[in-house]
């Protein structure tokens, strides 16, 4: 499949079948993420894969509690990939202090998108999750001081046929050459 076709086909999946995801497929997705570029090549990411009911429930009961309960649907996914980062890396500290940019967020976005695109190619569904209790989730995962839980990705076999994709803005509304114009 051509890359742009893959990107066009991919959509967020929130309902998964009970069919387990093969560990080799999970490893393939993480391998795609491992190869992602990062600021100064620091590769700040650490991937924690939750692929059994008990682990997902224990994690979800913490990370999706209180105001974050709207993300509890993810507890029905056969896999949740937690993307944690090491904050003490030099590129992260300098970027934040000098430029005000948290490069680890960009790095996680690139690596995570590699995961969801690889999953799509393998016939798996996925959904980014940004609404979770980061501190409680980090504690449930056993993250160390100086680490942060940055993102989650639910992964599995879609339970339903894919719905019609949401419309995206046309290029002429978002693309500008040489200078932004209204």
Model-assigned labels for residue ranges:
Residues 33-34, 81, 96-140:
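Small-aliphatic-rich amphipathic alpha-helix that forms the alpha element of a beta-alpha
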Residues 31-35, 65-68:
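Glycine-rich, charged/polar anion/phosphate-binding loops
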Residues 13-28:
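A short N-terminal beta-strand-loop micro-motif at the entrance of redox/enzyme domains
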Residues 3-13, 89, 151-182:
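C-terminal helix-cap and adjacent tail motif
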Residues 85, 131, 157:
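Short secondary-structure boundary segments
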Residues 41-111:
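Glycine/small-residue-rich phosphate/adenosyl-binding loop
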């Amino acid at each position: 499949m051509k890359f742009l076709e893959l990107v066009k086909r991919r959509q967020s999946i929130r309902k998964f079948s009970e069919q387990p995801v093969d560990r080799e497929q999970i490893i393939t997705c993480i391998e795609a993420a491992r190869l992602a570029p990062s600021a100064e090549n620091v590769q700040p990411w650490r991937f924690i894969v939750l692929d059994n009911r008990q682990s997902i429930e224990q994690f979800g009961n913490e990370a999706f509690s209180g105001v974050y309960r709207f993300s509890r649907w993810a507890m029905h996914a056969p896999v949740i990939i937690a993307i944690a980062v090491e904050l003490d890396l030099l590129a992260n500290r300098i970027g934040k202090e000098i430029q005000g940019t948290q490069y680890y967020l960009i790095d996680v976005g690139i690596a995570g998108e590699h995961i969801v695109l690889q999953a799509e190619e393998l016939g798996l569904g996925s959904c980014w999750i940004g609404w979770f209790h980061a501190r409680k989730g980090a504690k449930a995962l056993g993250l160390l001081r100086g680490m942060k839980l940055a993102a989650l990705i639910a992964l599995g076999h879609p339970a339903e046929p894919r719905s019609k994709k949401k419309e995206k803005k046309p290029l002429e509304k978002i693309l500008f050459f040489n200078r932004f114009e209204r």
